[in-house]
Amino acid sequence: VRDRISNLKPNEIGFQEVKNLRVNGQLQKTTAYETILKVELSKPILPKSKVLIELDFEAQVPVQIRRSGRDNAEGVRFSMAQWYPKLAEYDQQGWHPTPYVAREFYGVWGDFEVNITIDKNYVIGGTGYLQNPHEIGHGYEKYATLPFKPTQGNTLTWKFKAPNVHDFVWAADPGYVHNSKQ
């Protein structure tokens, strides 16, 4: 893997840059150490409590080498796993800040709300449940509880909810077709 990565051009290498992180709406101080982002919490997160963690980040989708990327060998435009900043798990043994270097990881289970804005010619398959079929079309509108209302412009925003999952994975391609049977 390292040989393939070292041969990539700058526009083919993936990266993520966290712009800011909020816990329950409050901005937190962060420091990056290679693939680890340390967060200095303004208040402790108590055991069995719930918090809302929001990240604003920029990323470049790499040419697919392993789990995630663009233009894979099967011809799929985007295959996206491990594509967002992941939280380290804290358990009975302490923190698990395992760096992401092409190996397995230890991660948090959680509830995801994900919005993906992409060219409207693409169809997305993603973890969880599509929340806005009435805006998407591509065959999903027949499952909508609201009347079909096509979005104006060249993009669509697909809104997913995925409860109690380990990762949010998605794939998108203009050649994908949504088929269903009843």
Describe the role of every protein-language-model region.
Residues 2-5, 36, 75-81, 121, ...:
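Generic secondary-structure boundary/loop-capping signal
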Residues 19, 24, 31, 40-42, ...:
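A structural detector for beta-sheet-dominated domains
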Residues 14-17, 72, 78, 97, ...:
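Polar low-complexity intrinsically disordered regions enriched in Ser/Thr and small residues
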Residues 44, 61-62, 74-81, 135-140, ...:
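Short, surface-exposed linear patches
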Residues 2-75, 148-152:
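A surface-exposed beta-strand-loop module
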